[in-house]
Amino acid sequence: MEKQEQLYEGKAKRIYRTSLPDQYWVEYKDDATAFNGEKRAQITGKGELNNRITAIFFTMLKERGIDNHFVRLLSATEQVVRKVEIIPLEVVVRNIAAGSLAKRLGMEEGTVLPQPVVEFYYKDDALGDPLVNASHIKVLGIASESDQATLERMGLAVNEVLVPYLRERNITLVDFKLEFGKTADGEILLADEISPDTCRFWDSVTNEKLDKDRFRRDLGNVEEAYKEMLTRLGGDVHV
């Protein structure tokens, strides 16, 4: 397999075509962004940490029956994924009130929700990735009702696997963002990444934040928190 032209560059990754028609080459960057790109910085080693953390999560989820686009690691910062067309919806699953949910509904951060809350956000940087409901999704033609139901079901299935998996490692899964894509034959796969960039991870004992909130809120020690996550997931830290 050969790396070919760059297809896309986002806030955290570059995507390249490969010599195989059904696979892409993904390169993770050290760029850190928050607030829809308004806050930016470089965090040495972040690309490698997120690449390896994502590989661990996706491999584990595939073993537990949740199919995804991950194929294999290529290098410290690169991986091969199956080619999918990304559905322009971010699926957010929340177990504990934090971030925008706490602010929007006037809830105290850290409040345990009686059941997981699933939210959909329209992937559009120009609009600020707005929160949308089923009617919005239908009117905008973003996804069919059937696909929307599949995304919600898969999001909750991921949650059911991740919560106990992380609890065993003394990590509380507060909330997380998922993206999904369709293969050429219409199969919906979990895609993008699962990392401290896309999840809120708290230490189960101290509630110390082990995720991008350390960057968002200027808490410091961002790289150290990401390293701690990789270590607890059983990965070796080389950064």
Curated annotation (Swiss-Prot):
It catalyses: 5-amino-1-(5-phospho-D-ribosyl)imidazole-4-carboxylate + L-aspartate + ATP = (2S)-2-[5-amino-1-(5-phospho-beta-D-ribosyl)imidazole-4-carboxamido]succinate + ADP + phosphate + 2 H(+). It comes from the Bacteria. Belongs to the SAICAR synthetase family. The gene is purC. InterPro entries: SAICAR_synt/ADE2_N, SAICAR_synt_PurC, SAICAR_synth, SAICAR_synthetase, SAICAR_synthetase_CS. The keyword ATP-binding applies. It is an enzyme of class 6 (ligase). GO terms for biological process: 'de novo' IMP biosynthetic process; cobalamin biosynthetic process. Gene3D superfamilies: ATP-grasp fold, B domain, Phosphorylase Kinase, domain 1. Keywords: ATP-binding, Ligase, Nucleotide-binding, Purine biosynthesis. Its EC number is 6.3.2.6. Pfam families: SAICAR_synt. This is Phosphoribosylaminoimidazole-succinocarboxamide synthase. Pathway: Purine metabolism; IMP biosynthesis via de novo pathway; 5-amino-1-(5-phospho-D-ribosyl)imidazole-4-carboxamide from 5-amino-1-(5-phospho-D-ribosyl)imidazole-4-carboxylate: step 1/2. GO terms for molecular function: ATP binding; phosphoribosylaminoimidazolesuccinocarboxamide synthase activity. It comes from Brevibacillus brevis (strain 47 / JCM 6285 / NBRC 100599).
